[in-house]
């Protein structure tokens, strides 16, 4: 059996500080920032269009909403976006990863419904 060497008070303090820093970063990362919501609004607006970039963004957003129903998203498709839209997609991806919230929980059910009807159901009134 291996005897563990006790940590010095300095090392204990250092580890505690590190854990507090990690917890603080996690807490901050899970907060949704206004710039992320603005990026999401811009992506939704483009996804409601009828261009190639609109189709890519519809796939991206609908994969977030419900990938088993609407299909996944190939991350290499981000390469097909203009720089500004790619930056917005990365901001939204960060929000998705850290905030762990669905579009519906953020008040976007109606907008995502319009995108789904247009791109998955061929709604002529889109």
What residues fall within each predicted segment?
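Short runs of predominantly hydrophobic/aromatic residues within well-ordered alpha helices
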Residues: 36, 40, 53-58, 86-89
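Eukaryotic low-complexity, non-globular regulatory regions
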Residues: 4-5
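Polybasic, proline/glycine-rich intrinsically disordered low-complexity segments
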Residues: 70-126
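Short, hydrophobic/amphipathic alpha-helical patches that form generic packing surfaces
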Residues: 56-67, 91-95
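Alpha-helical structural elements of signaling/regulatory helical domains
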Residues: 49-53, 67-70
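Short terminal alpha-helical segments
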Residues: 8-51
